[in-house]
Amino acid sequence: MLPEEFRQLLAAKGIELTDQQMTQFDQYFHLLVEWNEKMNLTAITEEKEVYLKHFYDSVSLAFFEDFASDKAICDVGAGAGFPSIPLKIVFPSLNVTIVDSLNKRITFLTELVNQLGLANVSLYHDRAETFGQKAEFRGAFDYVTARAVARLNVLSELCLPLVKKEGYFLALKASKSEEEINEAKPAIATLGGQFQKEVGFTLPITADERHIVVIQKKKETPKKYPRKPGLPNKQPIK
C-alpha cells in the first residue's frame, strides 16, 4: 500500500486526510525506519508494508468506533506508537496517553511527537500493572487500546482498570478466537467489564485477518487489580 493508496482507501471509508496529515504520516515512516536501525521497534520497515500493517491497521479502529471528538485514549504497550499515534494524526482532538515498559520506546515516541508537532500526547515509562494502580489514571479513559500478543484475560487485567464507566477496552487481535474470549469472560466480569462484540475484517491487498474485541466497562474495577508486575501473566484471573 503506497501513501496515495492509503489516502484513497481511507477516503472510501469517509476519512479524508489533509496534505498536512499525509506529511505527518510520511515523517512517521521515515523516523520509524531511522530509529529502527538503532533499536528494535518493528520488523516491518518497507514503506508499503508500514502503511498497510501499521498505519492503516491502526486507523481501522475508527471504522467501528467514534474518535472524532476530544475523547481520552490510553494505549497500553504501544511499542512504536500503534494504534494511538496514527489515530492522533487522523483525529487531532484526541487526548492520547501512552504507557510502555521500555524506556527506549518512550525516547523514540518523545522524538516522534515533537517532530510531528502533536499536542495533548502524554508518554509514561511504566509497567501497566503499576500504572493502573495510580489514582489519576484509574477510570480516566474513554478508550483503552492494546495491540499485543498477550491473551485477553491478561490484557483485560492490565487495561480495564484504566477505562471509565461506560468506556471501552479495545483489544486488537490478528486472529479470531472464541476460545480465548470465553476463557477471558470470568476475568472481564471480575474487573467490571462486559464483552460486547468481536469485529472481524480483512486488510486490503493482503487480505490478512484482523479482529477487534470490544469490552465495555460497566462497574468500577476492584482496587486489588491490576496485581503486582508479572502476576497477571503468571496467574491469570480464572
Curated annotation (Swiss-Prot):
Compartments in which it is found: Cytoplasm
Keywords per UniProt: Cytoplasm, Methyltransferase, rRNA processing, S-adenosyl-L-methionine, Transferase
CDD domains in UniProt: AdoMet_MTases
EC number in record: 2.1.1.-
Binding site residues for S-adenosyl-L-methionine: G77, F82, A128, E129, R147
Spans annotated as Disordered: 217-238
Pfam families documented for this protein: GidB
One GO cellular component, as annotated: cytosol
GO molecular function, one term: rRNA (guanine-N7-)-methyltransferase activity
Family: Belongs to the methyltransferase superfamily. RNA methyltransferase RsmG family.
Function according to Swiss-Prot or TrEMBL: Specifically methylates the N7 position of a guanine in 16S rRNA.
HAMAP family membership: 16SrRNA_methyltr_G
Record's protein name: Ribosomal RNA small subunit methyltransferase G
Organism: Enterococcus faecalis (strain ATCC 700802 / V583)
Gene: rsmG
